[in-house]
């Protein structure tokens, strides 16, 4: 069991500290999603399936091009970044690494949910968010018990992974993406 002081330390390491640094990386995904949204909506309105498939594929490739290096850069520099902004602490650095990895899923969710809403599938986007949130709620307590400070991040990652999987499946159906249409 933990003392109140230890719990407060763990909570500060988990809650606020890594989020400030990972949100910079997540902002990249949000900007990618925002710039592609009008083009996706236009392609849906014009019933341009080939253009929609190319835009969808291009957005996912652009996301990968920026997010993977940015995320892995933060992961590699976790200890120096954590030391620069907070204090030298290996647990805080490890939580930052995990939070950066979770940020990939959050960024992907931002991208694909925007794309799905641009395809006028707002109800599906909300339903998939709710499903992911319910998965997170179900996993939160067991994950905290098993993985302690990493538990909430793991539950969040799995919840967003479920939402992203459902959204990507729906995008595939709506955009009728095939291998030939993305060339």
Predicted segments, located by residue:
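Alpha-helical transmembrane segments of polytopic membrane transporters and translocases
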Residues: 6-29, 60-62
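Interfacial segments at transmembrane-helix termini and the short loops linking adjacent helices
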Residues: 6-8, 75-106
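Interfacial transmembrane-helix starts/ends
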Residues: 15, 48-65, 69-77, 92-99
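Hydrophobic/aromatic residues within the transmembrane alpha-helices of Major Facilitator Superfamily
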Residues: 24, 28, 32, 69-72, ...
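Helix-loop junctions and terminal segments of transmembrane helices
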Residues: 27-47, 56-60
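Short alpha-helical transmembrane segments in multi-pass integral membrane proteins
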Residues: 55-75, 150-175
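Short runs within selected transmembrane alpha-helices of multi-pass transporters and secretion channels
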Residues: 94-120, 124-144, 149-172
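Transmembrane alpha-helical segments of multi-pass transport proteins
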Residues: 132, 179-183
């Amino acid at each position: 069991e933990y003392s109140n002081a230890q719990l407060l330390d763990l909570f500060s390491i988990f809650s606020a500290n890594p989020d400030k640094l990972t949100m910079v990386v997540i902002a990249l995904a949000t900007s990618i999603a925002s710039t592609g949204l009008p083009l996706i909506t236009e392609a849906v309105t014009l019933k341009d399936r080939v253009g929609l498939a190319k835009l969808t594929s291009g957005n996912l490739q652009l996301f990968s091009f920026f997010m993977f290096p940015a995320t892995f850069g933060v992961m590699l520099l976790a200890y120096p970044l954590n030391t620069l902004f907070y204090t030298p602490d290996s647990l805080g650095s490890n939580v930052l690494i995990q939070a950066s990895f979770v940020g990939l899923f959050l960024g992907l969710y931002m991208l694909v949910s925007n794309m799905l809403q641009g395809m006028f599938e707002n109800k599906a986007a909300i339903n998939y968010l709710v499903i992911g949130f319910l998965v997170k709620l179900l996993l939160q307590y067991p994950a905290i018990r098993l993985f302690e400070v990493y538990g909430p991040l793991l539950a969040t990652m799995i919840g967003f992974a479920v939402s992203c999987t459902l959204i990507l499946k729906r995008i595939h159906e709506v955009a009728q993406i095939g291998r030939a249409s993305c060339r």
